UniProtKB/Swiss-Prot annotation:
This is Aspartate 1-decarboxylase. PANTHER family: ASPARTATE 1-DECARBOXYLASE. One of its GO terms (molecular function) is aspartate 1-decarboxylase activity. It is an enzyme of class 4 (lyase). The gene is panD. Binds 1 pyruvoyl group covalently per subunit. NCBIfam families: panD. Substrate binds at T57, G73, A74, A75. It comes from Chlorobium limicola (strain DSM 245 / NBRC 103803 / 6330).
Amino acid sequence: MKLHLLKSKIHNAIVTSGDLEYEGSITIDSELLEMAQMIPNEKVLVVNNNNGERFETYIIKGDYGSRVIQLNGAAARCALPGDEIIIMTFAVMDEKEAGSHKPMVLIVDRNNNPKRRHRVGEEDELLS
């Protein structure tokens, strides 16, 4: 049996901008991508903490250190600049892999600066 498990997430990110004219996606600072172990073109589930909306899109790599979290295309209608969101990736694995899997969690501040990071069930690594 194959299971879909949380692979990684960026928690409490703040939307910095939106571009309705772009073809789609979410642009994320490449430094945050590295820290959260996410990659360009990876499918993400995004949850808007302000309005409860959930939507799927894919990642575009933003400039390193820019702290950009930009929603593009139709996704730009799902959250406004200043909204707090959670960005999640998932992986498919068998039960044996799932037994030892520990998702990566990156928590950011109101300016999208990394505050701390940890694998679920392990201690935080302070980053700021």
